[in-house]
C-alpha cells in the first residue's frame, strides 16, 4: 500500500451484541489482517494478556482507518469499554432479526458517555423480513433519542454476508469522519497503552498500541509504566510499513530492546522520560451517576473502575464540598444515587497508570448482565490526599435574660463551651444566623449575637466537622 503524507490515521470501533456480525463486517471492510492474529491464545494466556480486542485496517478516501473490534459478550464489557478509550468514531452493529439486546444498550451507553460519534449499522438484512427490519430501526431510533450525545446518529442497513449496503456505509462513515475536528497532541510526552505483546523470531519483543499523545522515533529511549522498565525503540511499523517516526493517533507496532513480552500486561503504558503520568493506587475524580442506574452507592462500597484499557476493583468514598463556619470542607456522602454529581476518592486494589484529566467509567460488575452495570462516569482531577469529614449537628435553645441572648444545650461545661467560641449557629425555623461570642457561668451556657431578633425557647443548631472513617 502506498502511504501518502496527506492520509489521516483514524481509529473506528466496532461494537455490538455477540453474534450480531461485527467480525463479519470487519472482514468486509478489511485490507490488512488483524494485529492480534499474530498472537496465539495459548501464548496470551501464559502472559496474562487476553486476546479480546481485534485490530484490522483499510483505507477510505484520505483516511487510513484502524478497526477496533470490541467483544460483544456480556462478560467482556470491561474490554469493550477499554476499546472506547482509543477510538475516534464507532460503528454499533445490531442484528436486524433479533433487534437490540442488553449489550447493545450497554455499548451504546459507553459510546454516549465517552461522546464517541457513532453510526448504527443494522446487519443481516438478507435474512430478516421487512417488518423485522422496520421494527429494529424503530427500536434503535427510540434508544438514540434517549441518549445525551448520539440523538442524531445515522442508521445504515447492510448485509455483511452479501455486501449489500457496504458502499452506503463507507460513504456515511467518510461523511462522519469529514465532520469531525480530531485534534492530536503531538507535542506532549508520549503515551501509548500497550494492548498486545509478543515475540517474533529475528525481531525480538514487539508491542502494539494506539498512540494517545506525543510522538515516537526509532532510537528513542522510553519507559514502560507501571513496571518502570527502560527500553529502546529498534523499529516502528504503521499499517505494515516501516516508518522512522509515528505520532498521536497512529496505530503502531514497535520492536523494543530491554523487555520480554512475559513482563507486560494490559495496563502497561509506553511513555517518554519527560512523562507526567502517575503510577497510583488512589485518585480523586469528579463524578456523575447515571439517571438510569437503579442502585445506591455508599462509602467503602466495592466497584470497578475503567481507566484506559484497564478495569480494576476499587473502593469508593463519595463526598461533597460544603461551607461550614466560613470554610470549605470535604463532607462524606452516606449514599449517592442516579442523577447525583459529587467528588469521589477511589482506592484501587492495584497500582495503575493515570493521567490528570483521564476519563473513567464506574461499574458494578457484581450485578447480573441483564441489568445496567455502568453506574456513572467521571474525570480524574487530583492524586493528593483528602481528609474527608462528617458533619456533627448539635441542637440547643435560645434563652433571653434582660438584654442578653444565651444558648443552652450546646455545651455541658465552660471548658467545652470555650471550644465553640466563634462558631456559627442558626435558627432553622427562621434561617437566622448568629455567632457564639463567649461563655456564661460554669454549666456550658453560651453568649450569642444574631443578625435579627430571636425569641426565647427557639431551637438553635450548630454544625461542626469531625474526621470521618
From Swiss-Prot:
Chain positions covered by the region annotation G3: 69-72
Region (G5): 159-161
GO CC aspect terms: cytoplasm
One function term, GO molecular function aspect: translation elongation factor activity
Keywords of the record: Cytoplasm, GTP-binding, Nucleotide-binding, Protein biosynthesis
Renumbered residue ranges of the record's region G4: 123-126
First-listed, main subcellular location of the protein, grouped into a coarse class: cytoplasm
Pfam families: aSelB_III (PF21440), GTP_EFTU (PF00009), GTP_EFTU_D2 (PF03144)
Family annotation (InterPro entries): EF-Tu_GTPase, EFTu-like_2, P-loop_NTPase, Ribosomal_eL33_sf, SelB_III_arc, Small_GTP-bd, T_Tr_GTP-bd_dom, Transl_B-barrel_sf
Location of region: G2: 48-52
Start and end residues of each stretch annotated as G1: 16-23
Binding site for GTP: 16-23, 69-73, 123-126
GO annotation, biological process: selenocysteine incorporation
Location of this chain's protein in the cell: Cytoplasm
CDD domains in the record: eSelB_III, SelB_euk, SelB_II
Superkingdom of source: Archaea
Domain spans labelled tr-type G: 7-181
Function: Translation factor necessary for the incorporation of selenocysteine into proteins. It probably replaces EF-Tu for the insertion of selenocysteine directed by the UGA codon. SelB binds GTP and GDP.
Family annotation (NCBIfam families): selB, small_GTP
Family (UniProt): Belongs to the TRAFAC class translation factor GTPase superfamily. Classic translation factor GTPase family. SelB subfamily.
The protein's name in its UniProt record: Selenocysteine-specific elongation factor
Gene that specifies this protein: selB
